[in-house]
């Protein structure tokens, strides 16, 4: 089977979405939470698989993301802000799908109920 078009990348990550949280400090040391670091590593793994050995995208990028959680409670409130989920995705894909998240010029994101997962579509704009 041929690799997908290098200007369109689809990532399906069957992992629970984790929002970005501010970097924690301990004395002079700065670190992310273990949960956030594990999410970034896992999403990076699925992104590498989706790249099929391609080089990172070079141009302006449109990013669409869907974040799914099991139906418990409501989509608003304590589950996390959609912009923090996006920040986690942008950080995770740096150097894998694109050289720098500054290349992302258009975003779309939604939180939904369903089997926990993250769906991402990246399209290089002409």
Which residues fall in each region the model found?
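Acidic, proline/glycine-enriched N-terminal capping motif
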Residues: 1-126
């Amino acid at each position: 089977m041929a690799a997908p078009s290098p200007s369109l990348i689809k990532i399906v990550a069957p992992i629970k979405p984790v929002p970005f949280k501010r970097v924690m400090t301990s004395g002079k040391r700065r670190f992310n939470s273990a949960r956030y670091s594990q999410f970034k590593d896992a999403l990076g793994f699925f992104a590498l698989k989706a790249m099929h050995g391609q080089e990172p995208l070079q141009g302006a990028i449109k990013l669409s993301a869907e974040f799914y959680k099991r139906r418990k409670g409501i989509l608003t409130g304590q589950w996390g802000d959609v912009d923090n989920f996006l920040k986690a995705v942008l950080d995770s894909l740096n150097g894998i799908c694109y050289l720098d998240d500054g290349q992302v010029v258009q975003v779309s994101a939604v939180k939904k109920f369903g089997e926990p997962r993250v769906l991402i579509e990246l399209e290089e704009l002409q």
